[in-house]
Amino acid sequence: DIKIVDENDKEVKSGEVGEIAIKSPANMRCYLNKKIETDEVLIDGWMHTGDLGFINSQGLVTIVDRKKNIIIRGGENISCLEVEGMLQKHQSILESIVFAVPNERFGEEVGVCINFKKKESLRKEEINQFLNDKLARFKIPTHYWLADDSLPRGATDKLDRIKTRKLCLDNKIKSLL
């Protein structure tokens, strides 16, 4: 069995995005010696995957993002992948990683580390102008960093969001003016 649930573990309507939960005899029973982590993902026999998705009218499941890749800014949910997808459409941007930046007023804001093609450069105002008609205003990054070389990658050559975020917040990658 599969269902899509909201943050209160209530099933959502068809087409609405929520966390994917699975119930099966093949589900794991626990994380070994990790009761707290087990209790977070196994709720009433349902395993919460950490993936966000929806079930369409034909019953097909579409995964849209990871729960951990969601920025919550003042109660609004922002998908890192959605913002990255829009940034990829800019002709000067080679790659980008979007992540949450702590903020006292909103809880989190949108931050991004960018690697430009051919050492091109843009000001953050120019990038914001590009994004204005593509994203809701609250989804547009407020913090920018510029990678001198390619963005950090993990062992499988995937972009490393966690490492990039740490480098940016620790000021090891320069801020884009």
Label the predicted regions:
Residues 165-177:
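Acidic/polar alpha-helix N-cap and adjacent early helical turns
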Residues 10-41, 76-78:
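Conserved ATP/PPi-binding loop(s) of AMP-dependent carboxylate-activating enzymes
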Residues 1-21, 57-58, 120-124, 160:
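Conserved beta-loop-beta connector loops within the AMP-binding
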Residues 9, 148-168:
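Flexible lysine-rich "adenylation lid" loop at the C-terminal edge of ANL adenylation domains
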Residues 8, 24, 29-30, 52-139, ...:
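AMP-binding/adenylate-forming catalytic core of the ANL superfamily
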Residues 19, 69, 166-168:
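A short acidic/small-residue loop/turn micro-motif
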Residues 131, 144, 157:
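Regulatory helix in c-di-GMP signaling enzymes, encompassing the GGDEF I-site helix
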